[in-house]
Amino acid sequence: MNLRHIFILPALLAAMACSDDSPVTPDTPDTPEGPDITNSVEKLVSIDAGQTFQTIAGFGASDCWSPAFVGKSWTSHRAGITELLFSSEIVGGKPKGIGLSQWRVNLGGGSAAQGEASGIEDKSRRAESYLTDDLTYDWTRCEGQRYFMDRAKELGCNNFVLFSNTPPVQYTYNGKGFSARGGLSNLKPEHYGDFAGYMADVAARYTAEGYHISHISPVNEPQYNWDSGQEGSGWTNDEVAALARELD
């Protein structure tokens, strides 16, 4: 049995009340000081590396929302950013990254192509879709997201989860990537099969390109009443079940 001892030394904290006019001059210099926290405390923690309590299948994160922009436009920094996320390499005793083993990929609803007409004011909360208005696929889209997927696989992360915040705008009641129906789905009843087929087609495309798609998550936070703050849709349990059956 190997025991490792870790000594934890908390950082020193300081508190200061500042005025709105000056970031360095307190409004009330005579304000009583807080408790004295200048004394560090040394604690001993013992870790038994030979005892297993659980098995973690994956350590992951999501590409919502910044990677779509970073991967496409931040060409001078994107390689370093992806290395910080996906690298498991140790150099000089220090990790080059956090070694993510799973990556969630947003199947956007197409509000990015709508621009201001999408009704989503914050452009960073709009997303691209491979589905075009004539219901064909444009596989050159989602360039930034595909860059992150490619780098993830290159650096050793090859478990991808596809997820959707909203059906494609071509299939929704209001033609938008957000819902005006409260807790009900924004997906028109006649398009359940189309939406399921779209997700399956994207998964098949990625699989053919060598990405391991371990899961498809067809709805995201379905009990929230999404508005125009970002892409999103509510879903009832019956609606989720109907979509899952189409996707199966």
Label every PLM stretch briefly.
Residues 1-7:
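Bacterial N-terminal signal peptides that target proteins for export
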Residues 14-17:
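C-terminal motif of bacterial Sec signal peptides marking the signal peptidase cleavage site
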Residues 19-21:
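Bacterial signal peptide processing site
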Residues 23-46:
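Acidic/polar, low-complexity intrinsically disordered N-terminal segments immediately downstream
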Residues 42-213, 234-241, 245:
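N-terminal catalytic cores of secreted or lumenal carbohydrate-active enzymes
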Residues 219-240:
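Polysaccharide-binding and catalytic clefts of secreted carbohydrate-active enzymes
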